A protein has these predicted regions:
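Extreme N-terminal basic, low-complexity initiation segments
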Residues: 2-6
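Short, Lys/Arg-enriched N-terminal segments with co-localized hydrophobic residues
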Residues: 16-34
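Surface-exposed extracytoplasmic segments
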Residues: 34-374
Length: 374
């Protein structure tokens, strides 16, 4: 996240029809908010197709489900439909706490036809090749957007959906501002009973990958860590990572001022997260809980939070009920109230979002592809 990922909340303001070509500030609930999901190059800055909004990992029907959402239309009428035909969309899987991924599922798309449909291909890369860009990998299946494709215990669907994410963005403003400034969080004027879902009626492009429990590496009981990335072909013939994300809400909370989308976290491998950002993030969390009086050991709490969130890889035990909640962070379902959990974590106290999973019940399904196509 983000990627927003990724990241929703980064896209704060945007009921006013912003163009994704502009990274200027907008005002929500009386304060300025940056539109801060990563824009890493001039080309990326013009293309929401590369912006990761969310990633989900959960148990399906005797399977593991991986979902990556990109290209939210909350950025306005200039959003380009579909997936970028010169990009790669990758799910990265680590096993048993390993530093590097040894399984990558890579999804690519061709240019859209007259009906807006795109040919899609899924490749799998294993071992050391899973973290490299040059290997082609094994072609698993080929299909078209808007239609399910399957082969060898793997199913893939990609297309436009109703966005299942939910948050009242005015609450975000009350938390990420203090995190940035190291001041106390003041929720005295926050009224959870009046919360509204800022993402109601919005749409995203979604990639849904379902892998059978018969997969030799993804059998029940296997401990995995998952993150996703978008990559864009370069003029030199290589690939540049544009966005990536594991845990939800990372950019909206910790890097809300990344208005030019040049934060090095965009292109960094998760294995470098703690070294690059651990001290900085721990200090900010410590300052917030110290000012808010929610911890007797602010420095220790800040370090504890960072140790939980870095590397930015979402943990999951294959075959178990997924939940991104207060009891555990084990994968993430479409219903989970991830913003409430993440905001509470950095605040050091419970933050009531005022929203329940039922607010977006109509934006998710019980069967493959588990999302609601539009």
């Amino acid at each position: 996240m983000t990627p927003r990922y990724a990241i929703k909340a980064d896209l704060s303001m945007l009921h006013q029809g912003l163009s994704s070509q502009h990274a200027d500030n907008r005002r929500i609930a009386g304060r300025e908010f940056p539109m801060s999901h990563h824009l890493d190059t001039p080309l990326a800055a013009q293309n929401g197709q590369l912006f990761i909004d969310d990633m989900y990992v959960f148990s399906g029907n005797d399977s593991t489900v991986f979902i990556m959402d990109v290209n939210s239309n909350i950025t306005g009428v200039h959003v380009q439909p579909g997936f970028h035909h010169e990009a790669r969309y990758e799910f990265k899987v680590h096993f048993d706490g390993a530093e590097f991924e040894t399984l990558t599922y890579r999804v690519s798309f061709e240019q859209a036809d007259a009906q807006g449909r795109q040919v899609m291909k899924l490749h799998a890369l294993t071992g050391k090749e899973a973290r490299e860009d040059s290997p082609a990998g094994e072609l698993v299946l080929e299909g078209r957007t808007g239609e399910a494709a399957s082969a060898g215990g793997v199913r893939l669907w990609a297309g436009r959906i109703a966005d299942p994410f939910y948050i009242d963005l005015s609450l975000l403003a009350k938390v990420n501002g203090p995190v940035n400034s190291g001041t106390a969080i003041d929720l005295s004027d926050w009224q959870p009973e009046n919360a509204k879902n800022s993402f109601a009626g919005t749409k995203v492009e979604s990639i849904v990958l379902e892998v059978s429990h018969q997969h030799p590496q993804l059998k029940p009981g296997t401990r995995i860590g998952v993150w996703c990335a978008t990559k864009l072909a370069t003029d030199a013939g290589g690939w540049r990572q544009i966005n990536r994300g594991g845990y939800p809400m990372m950019w909206p909370i910790f890097w809300p001022d990344d208005t030019h989308f040049t934060n090095s976290a965009n292109t960094r491998h998760p294995s470098k997260d703690f070294e690059a950002e651990g001290k900085h993030i721990a200090e900010h969390v410590a300052a917030v809980v110290a000012a808010s009086g929610t911890s007797d050991d602010p420095k220790g709490y800040g370090l504890t939070v960072v140790r939980q969130l870095f590397p930015d890889i979402l943990p999951y035990v294959v075959g178990t009920p997924a939940t991104f909640g207060f009891a555990a962070r084990n994968g993430r379902t479409l219903a989970d109230n991830a913003p409430e959990v993440m905001l509470s974590l950095v605040a050091g106290t419970g933050v009531n979002s005022g929203l329940k999973p039922s607010i977006a019940e109509g934006q998710r399904g019980k069967n493959f592809p588990y999302v609601v196509p539009m």
